[in-house]
Amino acid sequence: MIQNKNRQPDLYPVKGRYSPGEPVSLMLETPPDFADEVAITCMHLEVCLFEARCPVTGGKEQILLPEFPGDFLGLGVRARLYKDGALRATLYTAADISEPGRVVRYGFLSDFAAEDADDDGDVASMAKYHINLVQFYDWSYRHDQLVPPSEEYQDMMGKRNSLQCVRRKIDACHARGMGSTAYAAVYAASRPFWEEHRDWGLYALPGKPLVFIDTFYFMNIAETCPWHGHIIEQYRNVMAEVGFDGIHMDTYGYPKTALNAAGEPCELKEQLPKLIEDTAAKLRVGDREPR
């Protein structure tokens, strides 16, 4: 829950994004006896779209604005607080009215412990700052097996996660107009996976695998390597089984060039676009584009 610890009046959107035609809900927080009336003015650029006055009782109160037509509409909101007819404070906020993916303001989550499953305060805080797409960082089981085999699990760095928590955070994002993307490196694998698929790996020198922090083994993303299809299938599993809206396909910034298992040079700048295109094609469902 968002708490106004300073006991100062505050105004903020309940959602990071509102769909066209959806009523806009705002949260007004005021200390007890601070105000008895609020005057709301909604603007788009210099055009006034809506004005209203309503009583204030103190504490947290939701203000429901009407539907506003059109897509890609930035709504500026001013709230003037009055007590016995005297102006006490003027507050400002904004609301984004747009279709999913029209504009992106990116946030992230990284805590998915079982004890956090019922706490959506982090997501509520991001809505306050108009975040509309959230990356779930380090949520997965393994980089080569993203979906965990059990409800509670440890990731490759030993962090304990809960799949129930991940799913509830996704639901919390959706309830606040935010999409969710699953962090997933495009070419990282665990040592056991690499040992079983050495011919899928990338190498600094013949026989010398590329490894990041002695943990993540680089794999060959070329279309001709089975890793290409393997990681795309992992992405499909993530969306189908966990409920994410898309994938954050991460790279580590290097290497630019490496060797495949046969000692042949691989130019990643040529291979990454193809991996992205193939992933988008596999994850597309009807007219729904992955995020």
Model features per residue range: what roles?
Residues 1-20:
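Short, compositionally biased P/S/T/A/G/V-rich stretches that sit at domain boundaries
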Residues 24-32:
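Aromatic/hydrophobic beta-strand junction motif of beta-rich domains
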Residues 49-102:
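Extended acidic/polar, glycine-enriched regions
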Residues 89-142:
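An acidic-aromatic substrate-binding cleft motif
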Residues 99-102, 112-116, 182-242:
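Active-site-adjacent "subsite" loops/lids of carbohydrate-active enzymes
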Residues 105-108, 134-136, 180-182, 247-249, ...:
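Hydrophobic faces of well-ordered beta-strands that scaffold small-molecule active sites
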Residues 122-167, 187-214, 222-223, 256-257, ...:
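Aromatic-lined carbohydrate-binding/catalytic grooves of carbohydrate-active enzymes
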Residues 223-291:
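Active-site neighborhood of glycoside hydrolase catalytic domains
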